[in-house]
Every structure is written in C-alpha cells, then in structure tokens.
Amino acid sequence: MAINQGKYKPSICAIDEVDDRSFKLHNSQDEIGGKQQLQQIEGSETAPLTTNQQKLHMDDGSHLTPKDLEAARQDALNEVAAGGAGGRTPAAITPNSTHPSANGLRALLLPGRRSFDALMSLSRKRRILYVTTACLCALLLLIIILLLAFWPEVPFYLRAPLCLDKECVESSRQLLLWANTSKSPCHETYEWACGNFASDYANHEYFVIKRGEWNYETYNEYQELNELNRFIAMLPNSQEGSVESTVSSLYRSCRETDVLDKSQSDLLLKRAINAVYGWQAFRDSNRLQSWEYKRVLVVLQAKHGIFPYYRVTVENGFSNPHDYVITLDEGELGLPDKYFYGNDADEEVVRGYKLLLRDFAINMGIVSREADLFADDIFHYERRIVNHIEDAKADANRPINKLMRLADLKIKAPSLPILESLQAIFPKTKITEDTEVLVRDPEVMHALSVLLSTSDKKPINNFIVWSLARKMLPHLSKEYRTLAETFDHALYGRTASYPRWLICSKVVRDWLPFAVDALQQQPPRQQFETMTSKSRGLNKTQGNEELLKLMFFSLRNQLKDSLEQAKWLEPAARQFIQKKLNEMRLQFGIPDEVLQQPTYLAQYYNELILNNVFFVEHLEWIWTFRRSQMEKKLGPLAILDVIVSEMYTRDNPQAIAYSNKLNMLLVSKVLISSNYYDYRYPVAVNFARIGTDILEALIDNFSTFLLQFNTQSTDISDAAPEIRYAQPDVNCLAAGQPPRLVHELNELSSNALKSFHVTLSAARTAARALSNFVNAIDAGSAIQGSGIDQANTYEALGLTRRLRIPGLRSFNENELFTLSYMQQHCSTTIADKDYARIKPLVESQLAESYLFNATWQHIQFLPRSTNCAAAEATCSNLL
C-alpha cells in the first residue's frame, strides 16, 4: 500500500488540524527507560499527517485499487490493536506534554473540535442553515437579556385594583361623556376637559332651547326637571284638598294655558289694571284726576306681591339671636341690571326692551304713535330711577343695613307709603310707627322718595301698570307670551320656545318647593330602600349622609385654616368667622320629625287655594300664601318650623343653603339622592362637585358674618367690611387677558364680583381639603370635629380601598379632582349672541368660559396636578 505523503494538497478543510502540526510520539518500547522526544518542525511538509489528514488529503487514488485501500485500512486497524495488546498507546509528542494543565485544556476543547469537524463534514447549505440558526438564537438570547436589564417598572395605576361597581362605572361615564383625554391638559385644557361637551349638547333634547348659556348647572337643572315631570305624572289620584292633588292641579292648570285666547287675556289684564285704579292710556279712563299712587302702591304690593320702588322681605337680623325682621330694599325694574340704562348699554337689548313695551301697548289697543311714546316714557323713567339710586350710592361713607323706626324712616322718605304697605302685607301683625325695620340703604330710600315727589302722575301710572303687566305676560295667551320670548331672544340669543312640560315643572318646583321635596322624601320610600339594601350594609341615603358629614367637617377645618392665612381680614373678624364655623351644624333635608307627622304638610298648605279658572289667576293666590308664611316668621316658631321656613320661604330655594338664624347648613335630600353625588363615587369627584358647592354656600355668607360682626362689635368702624372682602383684585385676575376684559370686570356689579371671588376661593379650599382628607384616610386618623369611629366608618364607606375607575385608570385623586372640577365650567353659547359678555349683568355671574380660564390660571393646584406649569404668584383677597 502506498500513501503519497509527498504530494500534500492543502484544502479548505485542512485548517482543522494545521494549527497543531507539531506533536510527540511516545515510543512504547522506550517508555520505561526514558522517553525520546521527536519534535517536528511545525508547518514542514515532512511532518507526518494525522489520520484525518491522511483521509482528507490522499490522492484521488486513481493508481490504487480497492484491494490496496482495504489493505491499508486493515494495517491501520492492526497497528491500533497491537498497541492496545502490548499495553502501549501511541501518544502525540508535543512540546507541552510535560504540563498536565495543557493536556487538560486540550481534553476540554476536544468535544468542540469534534463538533466543528462534524459541522465541516456537512454540506455547504446545511452548514449555512445551522450557523444562521445559531446566530438567531444568540441574538434572541441577547434581546432577552437586554429586555430583562432595561424593562421599565410597571406603573402603579396598572397594578392598582380596578373598581367595577355600578357607581364607579357611572362616575367614569359621566366624566368621559364630555372629556377628551387624548388632548394635552397643558396646551389644550378646554378640549381635554370639555372637548365633547358641545357635541353632547347638540344631541341633547335641550338643544336650542336653553337661553343664553348651556353649562353644567343648566344640564343638572334639566335632569332635575325631567325627573320631577315624571314624578308628578306618577302621583296617585288623591282626594280634593290633599297636597298631591294640589301639585297635580297646579301642573295641569299650567299645561292648559294654551287654551287661553287673546280676548280672555285682554279681559284678565284689564281686570288687574282696574284693581290698581286704571291706566291713563285707556280712552275710557278718567285721566288720573282721582288717581293716587300711594294707595295704588299699597294694593300692588299687598295683593300682587309686586314692588316697583321698594321691596319688602323678611330676613334675619344681624344682632343676636338673629331674629326675623322686616327688611326694605330697592325695588324691581324691567331690565335685569342697571347697566342697560347707561349710555354705553347693549343697544340690541335696549331696542328689544322698547319693542316689548311698544308691542304690549299695541296689543292692549293703544295706537302705534302712543305706543311708541309709552315705550320711551317707561324706559326713560326707569333710567331716572337708576340715576337717583346711583347718585345716592356715590357716598362710600353712607350708613347701610341700618335698623330704623318707621317714624324715623317716614321723615327720611316721606313720599314712600312704607307704613301703609307693611300694615297691608302683614295684617295679623301689629305694625306701628315704633316698629323697627332693617333698611339696606337709607339714602336710596330718600332718593326714591325725592323721585316720586318730583314726578308727574302719568309716568308713575305707566310704570306701575307696566310692572303689573310684566309679571303676567308669561302666563297669558300665546300672543302675549310671544312678546316676552322676543325680548328673551334679544337678551339671551335666538332659541326655540321652551316645551310646556319644562315650564310647568319649573313652576311647580318654584311655587311649591316644600310639597315637592316632602313628597319625594316620603318615609315609606326610604323604608323600602332600607329593607332592600339591608343585606348589603349601608344604603345610598345612609352612605351619602355619612360621607357628607365627613366631607363637611374636613371642608370646615380647611376653611378655618384658610382664614388664618387671610391677612387681608382683620384678626378680630377672622376669629368671629371661625367661631361661627366651629358652632355650625348640618341638616339633611326635611327633618324626619316633620315627615312623621301625617298632618304637618296638609296644615302647611291649608291656606293655599288654587280653584281659579285661569292659570294666571294663581299668581295672586300664590303670593297670598307666601305673604302669610312671611308673616308667620315675625312671630314665635318651633325649631322644626324654623328649619322648614329657612329652607322653603326664600325667593329661590337652593339645594344647599345656609341659615343665619340657626347657624346651620341645609342640604336637600333630593340633591344627595341624585346621580350628581354618591358616596361610592371617587372621593375626588365628590369633593370637586358637592364639596365646592358647600364651600360656595359658606363663603358666600362670609359677608353676612362680617355685617353681624360689625353690628356686635364697637371696635370696627362702619367702613363696610363686606365691600372690602367681596372685591377681588381685578387687575391681577385679568393679567394676561385682553384690555377689554379688564374694563368689563371693573364695570361689573358688586354681586357679580362677589360670585367671582366665591368661586375661586371655594375651588382652592376644596383642593386643599381633598389632600388632607386623603392623607387622613391613609393614616387612619379621624377628621377633627367629626366624632366618629374612623376605622369602621372608613371601611364601611369603602374609603380605604382606593380603587381606580374604568376608562380613567391612569388618573390619581388629584387628576380626577381637576377633571371633575373643570367640567363644572364647560359651556356653549347660542351662536347668534355674545351672551358671555352680558351674563354677569343678567345673572350676576361671570360666564363659564371665563371662569374656566380664570380657575386654571389662578388656582395652582389644578395645573400642577396634571404636571403642567403653574403661575407662582397668587392674587390677593382669595382664600
């Protein structure tokens, strides 16, 4: 057998063993006596080849027969066998054979070499496949290692438990209904909070019906009236004279107004005008020869409850024990604010008002030329009244809110028949010249007296007749109602007519508020709710009241702390207000003792008679009933009667009101049983809604507290702390706004500026109270003044769970508060009227669009809660 070693042909596969061409051969025969090392020069062509090299680099064997190849293979096998039989194994002779560590390394690398040899023995395509797979696996392993090393921490809100209760889902639905959380709260704040508000209004049943501004308040009012309409429809048929029948009868009579035709309306108007001894514009009148305005004013006030020059009410006095006292203030005018009688007034509103006056006269049969004169005379006479009042208020040092004997007031204002009016309005009360009354502004009474004494009978007669007709117009036939709606278009913007069910539901609520709330708060309904919810612990009414108590004490405590920081209030005044807050109590709805008396409600409305043929005639009887309730307040009342009187004898009963007589916060149960508030809603949502409502009711009465302090203290001058307190820094609040806005804010009435101050102060205080409330829950500490077992109460109300709500899972308490509060200022106006500019003059409240921007700019908590930049400086005169 011949193996051609001299013709060694290197190939690509020879690299597997070229790196170790030097080796040692151990002579088995000389192994005992000594080892002869034979070292070959690495890379020489004479170096013996290994077995694998021999296999890979032998000649193609064209001159070798298969028999020669087989013989060579057999020789190799025999050689190996012989070495094994003789106890000797051929060993490679290497320079490092004497070092065991090197041999160990070679032994370790030997399996890798064999794997590599096996890989090289494969075909090229299979080698590429295996190498690619190995690279991909290595890359995948590297990616996994990098992901494990740099994987971000899972946010808390994704790990926090999610609340899936019905109330949590409902609160989320309410917030997401108007919000567009895909927008940036820092750069697109309104779109973030109210992005879907306008589109929801466009799809609402109230679309183009609400006059002026559709906002959160009007949205809730619509929901309330809609529920009341359904409630009235479900009232059972009761016997004649019951409260249920009175409510149903009033509602039906209101719905039937459309059957009244113009001739009947003319007859009703003329009958009412004859009751005030005629109108000089009628041709058949006696041309005012025997007409006496003092006698007419007494009839107009006592019979119809209309107060054209001075207004009579019964309010709380400023001296302890804050008993009721007859109060006199300036009277009513045709336009909503004195601004509209100025030289720079809104021309569209003035033109609409004159058109209303003119069309009324024409409908009453007055020819066009005289109707135009009538309109001009009324407007200019009302302007004279405004000018006299403003001149009287020019002196900032004049006395206000002064108790005066009627004899002294008669000397001050001899042309006003005040004594005669009071004797007619309160016939069961002894009214004499020694009776003391509270006069809001004695100088205004004097100015009005001068005006009457210097006016002719004709403008006085026109003004009194118009005051009577203006109150009747909305309840007459369609021809007269259209006149009032046309003026509303000039004032609020062009809208559709209110649906009749909405008007009548509002009439029932405003005229019979105690009956409506009492029927909705019947004990049988509560007992049924308690029985059905007993197995689940607290029912909604109980839970709402318990949480509201905690919120009230938390808000009160924060309000006291905010007062401590109000250095713009004198220390003695701050202490007085804090004392009032410490002694304040809380009342939910009508007392249970009242509802448990089966005859209380019937006796309350015993004097109300609604048996008239036409709805407009109810006006007189409703006023007679209200007048009797006012007179009862002048006598001794039981505590239950005082609570009912404080809640329902106001001109506009509020769901949350403060009683100066009782130093008590009154919260309607209708409100706390609605979807506006629920103890299972997130705490932040409740603080942003009903929490700010409570604070606004309290802060709004701080001016009254200061008047009480003025009356009871001799250390404070008559510098009218109410005015200083209620006036915010207009220049600061309007910083960064157009100059026109600064001018408009300075032109606002004190009531409008006061509401602005109240809104901002309430929001800031509520945000701080929320933080303290949440910290108290986390720490398990009690709310100061609440007097509760905090551990059981917090657990029963579910306050310790701190669950996230669906759809807003990433929002913490502060962000939820911000979103909920900002949505209270969502609004949209009628397209053809810039109502935002005149809203403060019409409603004594700033437009919601401005309040939205002002609260975001001047309440630092709101932008900071959403990680937005906030102004560091704060405006003065804010809590």
Swiss-Prot record:
Mode of membrane association: Single-pass type II membrane protein
Topological domains, Cytoplasmic: 1-127
Domain of life: Eukaryota
Glycan-modified residues: 180, 539, 701, 853
Peptidase M13 domain span: 162-878
Disruption phenotype: Increase in the number of differentiating germ cells.
Spans within the Extracellular topological domain: 149-879
UniProt keyword annotations, A-Z: Cell membrane, Differentiation, Disulfide bond, Glycoprotein, Membrane, Oogenesis, Signal-anchor, Transmembrane, Transmembrane helix
Tissue: In late third larval instar ovaries, detected in germ cells but not in somatic intermingled cells and is expressed uniformly in the wing disk. In the embryo, expressed in the ventral midline, tracheal placodes, and cells forming the anterior-most row in each segment.
Compartments, record wording: Cell membrane
A GO CC annotation given for this chain: plasma membrane
Gene3D superfamilies: Collagenase (Catalytic Domain), Neutral endopeptidase , domain2
Primary location: membrane
Entry's transmembrane regions: 128-148
Disulfide bonds: 163-168, 186-868, 194-826, 254-504, 732-875
UniProt cross-references to InterPro entries, sorted A to Z: MetalloPept_cat_dom_sf, Peptidase_M13, Peptidase_M13_dom_2, Peptidase_M13_N
Pfam families the UniProt entry points to: Peptidase_M13_N
PROSITE patterns: NEPRILYSIN
Biological process annotations from GO: negative regulation of stem cell differentiation; oogenesis; proteolysis
Family listed: Belongs to the peptidase M13 family.
Function per UniProt: Plays a role in the ovary in limiting the number of primordial germ cells (PGCs) that develop directly into gametes, allowing them instead to enter the developmental pathway that produces germline stem cells (GSCs) from PGCs and ensuring lifelong production of gametes from these GSCs. Negatively regulates epidermal growth factor receptor (Egfr) signaling.
Name of the protein described by the UniProt record: Protein gone early
Organism from which the protein derives: Drosophila melanogaster (Fruit fly)
Name of the gene this protein is made from: goe
